[in-house]
């Protein structure tokens, strides 16, 4: 029996991929093993997310320091959890939630709580001499995800680009994850050349995608289609498109303002807009296609497009089982984006994935725009057989680290590994 009793918990302030501070937590157990986790941070955040605790001291990191969260881990949380069993994840997470005592984890900070939650799981996995995906997922963990690669950025992730935040490719026709990654990388390099040939800038955004100045939102889809074809792949067969327009950012006074196009659309008109795009492009997944509080619009979107397209709730659902339960009962959306730091513990994250699966929904495991070398989400997506991962372009080490971990997992699984491909989706095409 591995000795997974917690001996010590320590936290420190480190930097994320955008040069902002974040929290890293180490959990030591009696076997001598240690688990370490770095917590990510988002750029466009849902109003209903768990609260990331920042210091607010303008003399350090422009107020973005996390020394308060670090202090909470090193004192309050460490004192409460030392002597507890790191392998009892549900109990650990329940204690963390009780210790905080707020609805949004705002007292101790969702960043402090998540760091401890994940580091406990990693320490227990190490004590059992198991990779994290196997420790969390058991013998059934064997599905490698289709990568949802953000290769063109706009909105809050770039400047002078499109109204919409992310344009992505999904190599659904690849025979393995390794090949899917190669296809994605080749299309990414092809896109760079397409943009360069048009005299555009090949600067990259937070998540590694290019952020050229484009005349219209649709121009982004057009150059991606060209890049796929130039790389030698067939859009609509081998490679599908996905989008995250982050429409909450465009919603004001009951309308969606597309500044690039000089238009303001009602919810019904926005649904028409997406229906038209889906009819003309091989769009398989649309995330936050409407604003986070536009419930009536979401129901309309699901009724119109739900059998053809994966409609993912991110800001809309914020990995929150209460919002997810309502969306399931009201038939708004048909997929949930899973971001660990939106809800703040591993247990609650796994609960959200389970609830989605029971309803016949899909779950897409996701990074945040502020990332690090931490690869927990790569193990999580295999552990849950979720079948889809969203972790940026095949560029920048903070993104590539996750892809490289998935390559290792696929190799380790050998003949048991199964690449999700089109099977990742629960729609008719």
Swiss-Prot record:
Q: Name one GO cellular component term.
A: phosphopyruvate hydratase complex
Q: Which reaction does it catalyse?
A: (2R)-2-phosphoglycerate = phosphoenolpyruvate + H2O
Report the Pfam families cross-referenced here: Enolase_C (PF00113), Enolase_N (PF03952)
Extract one GO BP annotation from the record. Answer: glycolytic process
Query: In the UniProt record, does the keyword Chloroplast occur?
Result: no
Under the heading Gene3D superfamilies, the entry gives: Enolase-like C-terminal domain (3.20.20.120), Enolase-like, N-terminal domain (3.30.390.10)
- SUPFAM superfamilies cross-referenced by the UniProt entry: Enolase C-terminal domain-like, Enolase N-terminal domain-like
Chief location category: cytoplasm
Q: Might you give the EC number(s) for this enzyme?
A: 4.2.1.11
Q: Where in the cell is it found?
A: Cytoplasm; Secreted; Cell surface
- Name the cofactor(s) required for activity, per the record: Mg(2+)
Residues reported to bind Mg(2+): 244, 287, 314
Instruction: Name the domain of life this protein comes from.
Output: Bacteria
Pathway in which the depicted protein is active: Carbohydrate degradation; glycolysis; pyruvate from D-glyceraldehyde 3-phosphate: step 4/5
Tell me which residues this entry annotates as catalytic.
Answer: 207, 339
Name the enzyme group at the top EC level: lyase
Going by the UniProt record, its keywords in alphabetical order are:
Cytoplasm, Glycolysis, Lyase, Magnesium, Metal-binding, Secreted
Cystine residue pairs: none
What would be an example GO MF term here? phosphopyruvate hydratase activity
Copy out the cofactor comment. Answer: Binds a second Mg(2+) ion via substrate during catalysis.
Positions contributing to (2R)-2-phosphoglycerate binding: 165, 339, 368-369, 390
Function of the molecule: Catalyzes the reversible conversion of 2-phosphoglycerate (2-PG) into phosphoenolpyruvate (PEP). It is essential for the degradation of carbohydrates via glycolysis.
Question: What is the similarity comment for this entry?
Answer: Belongs to the enolase family.
The protein's name in its UniProt record: Enolase
Q: Which organism is it from?
A: Roseiflexus sp. (strain RS-1)
């Amino acid at each position: 029996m591995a000795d997974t009793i917690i001996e010590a918990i320590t936290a420190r302030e480190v930097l994320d991929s955008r040069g902002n501070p974040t929290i890293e937590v180490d959990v030591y157990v009696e076997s001598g093993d240690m688990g370490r986790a770095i917590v990510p941070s988002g750029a466009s955040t849902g109003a209903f997310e768990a609260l990331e605790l920042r210091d607010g001291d303008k003399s350090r990191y422009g107020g973005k320091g996390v020394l308060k969260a670090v202090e909470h881990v090193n004192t309050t949380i460490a004192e409460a959890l030392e002597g507890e069993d790191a392998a009892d994840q549900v109990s650990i997470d329940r204690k963390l939630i009780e210790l905080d005592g707020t609805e949004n984890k705002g007292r101790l900070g969702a960043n402090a709580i998540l760091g401890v939650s994940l580091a406990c799981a990693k320490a227990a996995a190490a004590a059992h001499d198991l990779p994290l995906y196997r420790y969390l997922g058991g013998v059934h963990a064997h599905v490698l995800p289709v990568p949802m690669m953000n290769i063109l950025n706009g909105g809050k992730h770039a400047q002078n680009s499109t109204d919409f935040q992310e344009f992505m490719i999904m190599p659904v026709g690849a025979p393995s994850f390794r090949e899917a990654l190669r296809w994605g990388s080749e299309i990414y390099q092809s896109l760079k050349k397409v943009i360069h040939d048009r005299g555009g800038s090949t600067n990259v955004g937070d998540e590694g995608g290019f952020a050229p100045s484009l005349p219209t939102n649709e121009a982004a889809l057009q150059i991606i289609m060209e890049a796929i074809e130039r790389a030698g792949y067939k859009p609509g067969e081998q490679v599908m498109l996905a989008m995250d327009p982050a429409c909450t950012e465009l919603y004001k006074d009951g309308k969606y303002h597309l500044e690039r196009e000089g238009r303001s659309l009602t919810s019904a008109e926005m649904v028409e807009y997406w229906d038209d795009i889906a009819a003309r492009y091989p769009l398989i997944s649309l995330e936050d296609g409407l604003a986070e509080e536009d419930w009536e619009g979401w129901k309309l979107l699901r009724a119109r497009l739900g059998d053809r397209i994966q409609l993912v709730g991110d800001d809309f659902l914020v990995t929150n089982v209460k919002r997810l339960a309502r969306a399931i009962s009201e038939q708004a959306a048909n997929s949930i984006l899973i971001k660990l730091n939106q809800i703040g513990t591993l247990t609650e994250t796994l609960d959200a994935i389970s609830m989605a699966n029971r309803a016949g929904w899909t779950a897409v495991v996701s990074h945040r725009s502020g990332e690090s070398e931490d690869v927990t989400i790569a193990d999580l997506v295999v552990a849950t057989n979720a079948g889809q991962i969203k972790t940026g372009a095949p560029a920048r080490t903070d993104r590539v680290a996750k892809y490289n971990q998935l390559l290792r997992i696929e190799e380790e699984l050998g003949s048991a590994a199964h690449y999700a491909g089109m099977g990742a989706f629960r729609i008719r095409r």
